[in-house]
Swiss-Prot record:
Residue ranges of every copy of the Radical SAM core domain listed in the record: 54-278
Record-stated family: Belongs to the radical SAM superfamily. Biotin synthase family.
Cofactors (names): [4Fe-4S] cluster; [2Fe-2S] cluster
Protein name (Swiss-Prot/TrEMBL): Biotin synthase
Gene Ontology process terms (BP): biotin biosynthetic process
Function description: Catalyzes the conversion of dethiobiotin (DTB) to biotin by the insertion of a sulfur atom into dethiobiotin via a radical-based mechanism.
Keyword Nucleotide-binding part of the UniProt annotation: no
Classification of source organism: Bacteria, Pseudomonadati, Pseudomonadota, Betaproteobacteria, Neisseriales
One Pfam family cited in the UniProt record for this chain: Radical_SAM
Subunit structure and binding partners: Homodimer.
Gene Ontology molecular functions: 2 iron, 2 sulfur cluster binding; 4 iron, 4 sulfur cluster binding; biotin synthase activity; iron ion binding
EC number: 2.8.1.6
C-alpha cells in the first residue's frame, strides 16, 4: 500500500464540537437499528425544527473536464485505471459552461456545481476555473466546485473568484477507505477540507453507499461526516451507480429501506446541513424519493445528467415536486446584486 506524504506528515483526529454532539460510530449504528418508522419520524421532526420541509434546494452538476483521472476510485467511470469506454475530454470553453449555467438557472437551479476529473488542479487550472467561477457567479447563482486535492493558497484563490462551496467527499467509512481507493488516503481528504475551511469556503461533503459495505461501515461514514468541525453545510448522499468496467460493477444492490435509513440518520446527526439526494436517483421509484424527502433530504441534483451518469429529467422532477407539494428554494443574492435589490425594492431579473 502506498502511503501519501500527507498521511506521514500528520494524523487527523476527530475533536468534539463546541456546539454539536460528537458521534461515536456505535451510537450512529444504533440509530440505523431503530424501527424504520420510528427512525423516519424522528428524522422528520428534526428536519422540521431546522428547515421548511417543503423547500428543496436545486443544484445542477456539470463535468467541465471529463475522463482520464489518475485516481483509481473503484466506483468511478472517469478513472484511467478502468476500462469503461469513457473517453478523455479537454476542459470545456468558458462560454459553453456559462451557457449551460444559464439554462440550469432558467429551469430553477439555484446552484451550479462544476467538476473536473483530475487528482488536483495545477496553478494554471486554478486560473482557468477562477475565470469560469466569476462568469457563473455573474449570473446570480451560487457556485460549487469539485476539483480534487488542493495545494496551499488554491482555496483562497477560488474563494476570491467567488466560489461559494467546495465539494470534497469522504467517500466511505475511514476504516475501509483503502478497499475502495488506493491512490490516496482518507487523511488526504481531511487535509484539503481543512484548507477549504481555512479559506472561508462552505463545505459540501458526503459519500457513497451501496459499495458492498456493512451497516456498521455506513454508520462509520455518517459519523465521520457528522464529526467534521464545523459540520458540512451540504451533505450529498450518493447511491452507487454501477458502471460496467469499474471494480464495483457487480456490487450487491442496497435495499431501498437501508438507503432511506441513511438519509434519516444523516438528518438526525447533521440537523442543520442540507442533505442532498444525489447520484442513483434515476433508479429510485417516486415513492422511495418521497420517503427520502420525509426522512430529511432537502436538496437534489436537477438535470438529466450528473458528471457522466444519468439523472431524472427536469420535467419528471417538476412533476414529482408538484405531486409532493414541494417547491424550489430560492437563492438569495449577495454583493452588488443584493445591494441593488435592497436599495430599489426591485427584484433583479438575471
Amino acid at each position: 500500500m502506498t502511503v501519501s506524504p500527507v498521511a506521514l506528515r500528520r494524523k487527523t483526529e476527530c475533536k468534539p464540537h463546541p456546539t454539536a454532539r460528537y458521534w461515536k460510530k456505535c451510537d450512529v449504528e444504533a440509530l440505523f437499528g431503530l424501527p424504520f418508522l420510528d427512525l423516519i419520524y424522528q428524522a422528520a421532526e428534526i428536519h422540521r425544527q431546522n428547515f421548511n420541509p417543503r423547500e428543496i434546494q436545486l443544484s445542477t452538476l456539470l463535468s467541465i473536464k471529463t475522463g482520464g483521472c489518475p485516481e483509481d476510485c473503484a466506483y468511478c467511470p472517469q478513472s484511467a485505471h478502468h476500462n469503461t469506454n469513457l473517453g478523455k475530454e479537454q476542459m470545456m470553453d468558458v462560454d459553453e459552461i456559462v451557457e449551460k449555467a444559464k439554462i440550469a438557472k432558467s429551469r430553477g437551479a439555484s446552484r451550479f456545481c462544476m467538476g473536473a476529473a483530475w487528482r488536483g488542479p495545477k496553478p494554471k487550472d486554478v486560473e482557468t476555473v477562477s475565470a469560469i467561477i466569476k462568469a457563473v457567479k455573474g449570473l446570480g447563482m451560487e457556485t460549487c466546485g469539485t476539483f480534487g486535492m488542493l495545494e496551499e493558497g488554491m482555496a483562497e484563490d477560488l474563494k476570491e473568484a467567488g466560489l461559494d462551496y467546495y465539494n470534497h467527499n469522504l467517500d466511505t467509512d475511514p476504516d475501509r477507505y483503502n478497499d475502495i481507493i488506493h491512490t490516496r488516503q482518507h487523511e488526504d481528504r481531511m487535509d484539503t477540507l481543512g484548507k477549504v475551511r481555512n479559506a472561508g469556503l462552505k463545505v459540501c461533503c458526503g459519500g457513497i453507499v451501496g459499495m458492498n459495505e456493512t451497516r456498521a461501515e455506513r454508520a462509520g461514514l455518517i459519523a465521520s461526516l457528522a464529526n467534521l468541525d464545523p459540520q458540512p453545510e451540504s451533505v450529498p448522499i450518493n447511491r452507487l451507480v454501477k458502471v460496467e468496467g469499474t471494480p464495483l460493477a457487480d456490487a450487491e444492490d442496497l435495499d431501498w429501506t437501508e438507503f432511506v435509513r441513511t438519509i434519516a440518520v444523516a438528518r438526525i446527526t447533521m440537523p442543520q446541513s442540507y442533505v442532498r439526494l444525489s447520484a442513483g436517483r434515476s433508479n429510485m421509484p417516486e415513492a422511495m424519493q418521497a420517503m427520502c424527502f420525509m426522512a430529511g433530504a432537502n436538496s437534489i441534483f436537477y438535470g438529466d445528467k450528473l458528471l457522466t451518469t444519468g439523472n431524472p429529467d427536469e420535467d419528471g422532477d417538476r412533476i414529482l415536486m408538484e405531486k409532493l407539494n414541494l417547491y424550489p428554494l430560492q437563492f438569495e443574492p449577495e454583493g452588488e446584486v443584493a445591494e441593488v435589490e435592497k436599495a430599489s425594492g426591485i427584484k433583479v431579473d438575471y
